[in-house]
């Protein structure tokens, strides 16, 4: 190589390094290389069988239990190659498995209930650490908190605590785990009263990427505690946690479900905007769920508008708030007073509901401040147009609207957690069950719906709830525009420098 060429290359390298040092390119030490070894159940049994607790199961795809142990709500987020499932029997087993994977360069993924829409999980190849046996719940002597193990889920928790006169914030669907939603913030019917699930964390028992078990709370590893409350999927596996619990206030919840025809759309959304304002849903009105969907008994070509309100208290107080909606003529109107576990059935979010079924969902999602009525009409018209063109998609197509009370969420210091969306009020998403032949149609429909929502809020940047993200959203929209990603990535270099936790909407690209 002649002197001129060497000089040119050296100058180019200096220039390149200068550009890189000022760019947002992720440092090399956070870029994991996918060299995970292929493993077999027999190999893992030989290596780990004697050190794991009695009752731990190790099996692979040929085992009849494999399908249930790896099932996901959205089949589009099914990992590419789960080679081995380790269904741990004790919390201590999690650290042993992670340490084994760390030492042998094997990818690992924690699993509880398999929810979430993101396609980033589909890239995973390696060992699944299944937490489904870790279902212990222990109310503490002071009756102010309880210890929840990592495999608990909403239906189990609600039934256990309600019968003893207590509640804890959980997600809204009975089939969903506690910690999957919580590590992304954790929305639910009680957040108007008590904040997000993660706002109620007292202390977490966490296994880090190298297999180390550690305590994470406001005193011990406080920086990691901040990260776990909003971006926790990127940092560790929660094997158990102490979480605040509360005495239940009322013996029953009041629900009121409406079905409206399309000609009432403008009236309904105008009434919702007056009722909700921007973050003004009353604390006891835990949630209002809405959807556009085809109901064949009413019409096979025009979607109806379905809305369900849930109030933590007596019917009289709830119906006073719902007077504007009672004034809009409905195709049907049903209401009642039920226990909290029965409320999930009334709102069709119970563990046996269709909303919990595993399907090939395609979708999109965003946050809104309020409903742009013109845009909602455009989304409704698009829905009917797509169904007319592809009637086979009708049974599995929905436009969803979720309005949780955010009263308590807004009172909590935003700097206390990495959760970035305390000033967002309405969560919306589109989902359609798509066979392979219509997947491109479903994705185009999802993109068009999202584009209308985004255009309905001129001047606002897109915002995405991490637990509803589909995997193609800008990271800033998920984790925040105000420096959160910079801080989170610095914490990654401290707690997970090899980026082992990179499967669920990762803050550092795979």
Curated annotation (Swiss-Prot):
Its EC number is 1.-.-.-. Residues 78-248 form the FAD-binding PCMH-type domain. Keywords: FAD, Flavoprotein, Glycoprotein, Oxidoreductase, Signal. InterPro entries: BBE, FAD-bd_PCMH, FAD-bd_PCMH-like_sf, FAD-bd_PCMH_sub1, FAD-bd_PCMH_sub2, FAD-linked_Oxidoreductase, Oxid_FAD_bind_N. It holds the Pfam family BBE. The keyword Flavoprotein applies. SUPFAM superfamilies: FAD-binding/transporter-associated domain-like. The keyword Cell membrane does not apply. Glycans are attached at residues 130, 210, 352, 372, 415. Pathway: Secondary metabolite biosynthesis; Polyketide biosynthesis. Its cofactor is FAD. GO terms for molecular function: FAD binding; oxidoreductase activity. Residues 1-22 form the signal peptide. It is an enzyme of class 1 (oxidoreductase). FAD-linked oxidoreductase; part of the gene cluster that mediates the biosynthesis of virensols and trichoxide, fungal natural products that contain or are derived from a salicylaldehyde core. The pathway begins with the synthesis of the reduced chain in virensol C by the highly reducing polyketide synthase virA via condensation of one acetate and 8 malonate units. VirA has interesting programming rules since the first 2 ketides are fully reduced, the 3 following ketides undergo beta-dehydration, and the last 3 ketides are only reduced to beta-hydroxys to yield the trihydroxy portion. Belongs to the oxygen-dependent FAD-linked oxidoreductase family. PANTHER family: BINDING OXIDOREDUCTASE, PUTATIVE (AFU_ORTHOLOGUE AFUA_1G17690)-RELATED, FAD-BINDING PCMH-TYPE DOMAIN-CONTAINING PROTEIN. This is FAD-linked oxidoreductase virI. The gene is virI.
């Amino acid at each position: 190589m002649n002197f001129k060429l060497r000089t040119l290359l050296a100058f180019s390298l200096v220039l390149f390094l200068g550009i890189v040092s000022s760019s947002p390119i992720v440092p090399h030490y956070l870029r994991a290389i996918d060299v995970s070894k292929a493993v077999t159940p027999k190999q893992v049994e030989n290596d780990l069988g004697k050190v794991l607790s009695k009752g731990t199961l190790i099996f692979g795809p040929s085992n009849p239990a494999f399908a249930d142990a790896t099932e996901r709500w959205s089949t589009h987020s099914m990992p590419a190659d789960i080679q081995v499932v380790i269904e741990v029997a004790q919390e201590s087993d999690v650290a042993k498995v992670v340490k084994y994977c760390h030492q042998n360069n094997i990818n690992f993924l924690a699993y509880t209930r398999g929810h979430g829409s993101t396609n980033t999980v589909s890239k995973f190849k390696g060992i699944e650490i299944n937490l489904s046996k870790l279902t212990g719940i222990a109310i503490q002597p002071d009756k102010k908190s309880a210890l929840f193990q990592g495999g608990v889920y909403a239906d189990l928790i609600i039934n256990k605590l309600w019968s003893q006169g207590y509640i804890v914030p959980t997600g809204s669907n009975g089939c969903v785990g506690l910690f999957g939603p919580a590590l992304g913030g954790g929305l639910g019917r009680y957040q108007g009263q008590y904040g997000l699930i993660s706002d109620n964390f007292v202390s977490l028992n966490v296994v880090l990427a190298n297999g180390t078990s550690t305590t994470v709370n406001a005193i011990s590893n406080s920086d990691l505690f901040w990260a776990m409350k909003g971006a926790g999927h990127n940092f560790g596996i929660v094997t158990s946690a102490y979480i605040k619990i509360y005495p239940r206030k009322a013996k029953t919840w009041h629900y009121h479900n409406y079905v409206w025809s399309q000609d009432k759309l403008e009236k309904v959304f105008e009434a919702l905007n007056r009722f909700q304002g921007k973050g003004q849903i009353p604390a006891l009105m835990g949630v209002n769920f809405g959807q556009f969907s085809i109901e064949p008994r009413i019409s096979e070509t025009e979607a109806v508008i379905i809305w369900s309100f849930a109030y933590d208290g007596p019917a009289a107080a709830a119906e006073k708030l719902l007077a504007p909606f009672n004034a809009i003529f409905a195709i049907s109107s049903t209401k009642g007073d039920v226990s909290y576990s029965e409320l999930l059935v009334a709102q069709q979010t119970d563990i046996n509901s269709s909303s919990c079924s595993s399907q090939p969902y395609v979708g999109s999602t965003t946050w809104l401040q309020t409903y742009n009525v013109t845009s909602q009409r455009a989304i409704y018209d698009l829905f009917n147009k797509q169904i007319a063109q592809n009637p086979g998609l009708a049974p599995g197509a929905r436009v969803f609207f979720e309005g949780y009370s955010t009263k308590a969420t807004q009172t909590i210091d935003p700097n206390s957690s990495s959760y970035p969306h305390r000033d967002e009020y309405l969560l919306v998403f589109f989902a359609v069950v798509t066979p392979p032949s219509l997947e491109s149609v479903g994705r185009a429909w999802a993109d068009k719906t999202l584009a209308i929502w985004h255009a309905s809020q001129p001047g606002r940047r897109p915002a995405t709830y991490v637990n509803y993200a589909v995997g193609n959203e800008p990271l800033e929209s998920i984790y925040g525009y105000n420096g959160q990603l910079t801080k989170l990535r610095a914490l990654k270099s401290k707690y997970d420098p090899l980026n082992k936790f990179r499967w669920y909407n990762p803050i550092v690209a795979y």
